[in-house]
A protein has these predicted regions:
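Glycine-centered, phosphate/nucleic-acid-interacting loop/turn motifs that mediate DNA/RNA or nucleotide
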Residues: 70
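A short acidic, leucine-rich amphipathic alpha-helix
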Residues: 47-50, 66
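N-terminal leader segment of winged-helix/HTH proteins
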Residues: 1-23
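Short, cationic-aromatic polyanion-contact patches
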Residues: 23-28, 44, 77-97
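Short helix-capping/hinge SLiMs at alpha-helix to coil transitions
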Residues: 22-23, 37-40
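C-terminal regulatory/oligomerization modules of transcriptional regulators
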Residues: 116-152
């Protein structure tokens, strides 16, 4: 039996919400992102609240987060008083760049810890250095992927 496209759309939006929540974002922000990815068009602020069946306050918080991460952008439509939002250009590169920033913060913490380990603790230092190398490698790989996505 084939499923209704609206059913599939709803499940997709919910899945993106759950994935975003697992990454530390509000579930509503993920649901909004899923809606923008699926629909591919600008949506009025009030329509977001109606379509996702959440409060305008939740939409306001989520739009700020998604705008700060440069995943969506606010646009104006002639003759319309409310704000519209749409998927930003190259949002997936922006996602990767956000992850890279997080990895860089971890690297700083690891480096600070390394600086405090006495030189006579070579085994500990070696394990911590390997852990730092893991984060440097991930950061470099994600940076390259972001650059590749930007280049098209």
């Amino acid at each position: 039996m084939t499923r209704n496209i609206e059913e599939i759309r709803g499940e997709f939006i919910e899945k993106i919400g759950l994935m975003a929540q697992a990454d530390g974002l509000p579930r509503i922000a993920g649901r909004m992102l899923g809606l923008f990815i699926w629909d591919g068009e600008a949506v009025a602020f009030g329509d977001l609240a109606n379509q996702l069946q959440v409060s305008r306050g939740s939409i306001s918080t989520a739009t700020r987060i998604l705008e700060d991460r440069r995943l969506i952008k606010r646009i104006a439509k002639a003759g319309q008083r409310q704000d519209y939002f749409q998927l930003a250009e190259n949002p997936y590169a922006q996602m990767l760049e956000h992850y890279v920033l997080g990895l860089e913060r971890v690297q700083i913490e690891i480096a600070q810890t390394l600086g405090e380990i006495p030189t006579n603790e070579a085994d500990i230092k070696g394990r911590i250095e390997a852990y730092g190398a893991f984060y440097r490698t991930m950061s470099g790989a994600l940076s390259k992927l972001a650059d590749d996505l930007k280049a098209g």
